Curated annotation (Swiss-Prot):
UniProt-listed Enzyme Commission number(s): 2.1.1.170
Gene: rsmG
Gene Ontology CC: one annotated term: cytosol
Pfam families hit by this protein: GidB (PF02527)
Enzyme class: transferase
The organism of origin for this protein: Rhizobium meliloti (strain 1021) (Ensifer meliloti)
UniProt protein name: Ribosomal RNA small subunit methyltransferase G
Function description: Specifically methylates the N7 position of guanine in position 527 of 16S rRNA.
UniProt family annotation: Belongs to the methyltransferase superfamily. RNA methyltransferase RsmG family.
Amino acid sequence: MQASLTQALNGLRVSRETVQKLEHFASLFQKWARSINLVAPSTLEDLWRRHILDSLQLYQLSPGPKTWVDLGSGGGFPGVITAICLSEAEGGWVHLVESNNKKAAFLRVALRETGARGSVHPIRIEAAPAEIPSCDAISARALADLSQLLDYCAPWMLAEGSGTVAFFHKGRDYQQEVDKAVSRFQFDLIKHASVVEPDSVVLEIANLSRRTK
C-alpha cells in the first residue's frame, strides 16, 4: 500500500485489523470486477482512494453501533465499508439494498469473507421500508440526485419520532441539487468537505419534512 494511503488511513483512525479486512475486500472486489460492472472501470486503478477512503469517511462522521440502510449498494461503497468498520463495534448493522442479483451475490460474499456486520436485501429501494422498518442512518453514493434520494428516505425520516440521519456523497455541483431539493423539502444540512476530493462533499441531512403548498 502506498505511504500516502497508509497515512490517510491513520488519519481516519482505522485499526490494523480493519485495514486487513479492507485489504481482503479490495482483493475480492478486484476479482469480481473482472466479470461484473461494480464501478466505472476507469476508477479501478485508484480503488483505495476513489472508493475505499471515500467510503470510510462516512463512518468517521457517524461512528458507533448504529443501524444503517445503504441504498443502491452496488459494489459495496459505502455500505460494505461501513459494515467492516462496525465489526469492531459492539453492535450495529448495515442493511444493503441492491436489486441487481449479480451485485447482491458479490455483496453477500464480501460480507461473509470479511466478517462484516451486514445483510443483503435483493429488492428495489421502494420496497425496503416494509422490510427494514427503522434505522439510525441512511447512506447512498452515486445513486440519484438529492430530491430523489430524499423521496427514497422519506418513509424512514418522516416517521413519527424518527431521528434518522442521511449521509450522501456529492460532487462539485451539489449546491444545484440542494437548491432543487429545498423547493420540496425542509431539512437541517451539514456540508462535510470530502477527505478525498477537494470539490466534493458529504451532505448530512436531518429533521426532514415536506414543504406544504
